[in-house]
């Protein structure tokens, strides 16, 4: 059954930002879990070659941010961008050679992250202005009052196949179940800000670090077991959080591919259907909007 929501009462705010450059300092190097120093590309700028549906781990990168990394120069305006931009929202480039091209928000990290078609990404420069049609915060599931919704465009939620099942539970197709022990950096923060890094996906490093998550893909819908993200991020037995993988490979210990939260509530409220196709790439294609 289709979802009964308050989507008709949501408003859309047009927010502005710019493509933020990759940053560094003169010291450069970090160290991984085994004390090995590294200097690799990661956050910020325009990152080519990685999109929803592509693997999240195994790159020569640290804190990989696919597509465009977007923020605002004013601190408070930037926090509004972080808190109000939702996965699935439309992003439009407003300046530079690629002006007019559109993409989709795929999550939050240090920046708001947006995916575009590869040929369009290659025309975008750092400093280019963008707008985000922010819609989704305040969404409620009227027949699932125990489940908190956040950071997701209501149209995308339906495109992901989330619906009310015959038993009255919230049916959620998901690609992977993630054990609570995988949760790393990001715990304790607001769940409307940045994301949660998952340990155990250190592809190419020691097998003793593996939690079997090396197969995660950008855009995967994942189930975070015993995680309560309703009013923050923390461990709570008997609770489930649903997220979308928005960032990729990390070498820094305690970090990893990260899901942006979209649903959270008591585990008994959910009916999880494991499906390898539960990914933003499938949902975007099914909604008729390609990026």
Regions found by a protein language model. Give the residues of each.
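Conserved mixed alpha/beta catalytic, RNA-binding, or beta-rich assembly cores of soluble enzyme
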Residues: 4, 8-291
